[in-house]
From Swiss-Prot:
The eukaryotic PSI reaction center is composed of at least 11 subunits. Its EC number is 1.97.1.12. It comes from Liriodendron tulipifera (Tuliptree). This is Photosystem I iron-sulfur center. Its cofactor is [4Fe-4S] cluster.
Length: 81
């Protein structure tokens, strides 16, 4: 099951989420849309196991990284049965 990993503009570029990910889903790339001028995108979300270690590792007050598990994503889109 694929999960959705969202990175928000509160990212400070500390790389804690990248280092916490056991499946190497995240990586830092340059980006002008966040405070740190870099962001951890999720190019391989199919490898995300939904452990949410990236969320736990994030030091910002408003989590900069958020994992939406498959069932959370479908429920929010009104697709759950």
């Amino acid at each position: 099951m694929s999960h959705s990993v969202k990175i928000y503009d509160t990212c400070i570029g500390c790389t804690q989420c990248v280092r916490a990910c056991p499946t190497d889903v995240l990586e830092m790339i340059p980006w002008d849309g966040c405070k740190a001028k870099q962001i951890a995108p999720a190019p391989r979300t199919e490898d995300c196991v939904g452990c949410k270690r990236c969320e736990s590792a994030c030091p910002t007050d408003f989590l900069s990284v958020r994992v939406y598990l498959w069932h959370e994503t479908t429920r929010s889109m009104g697709l759950a049965y």
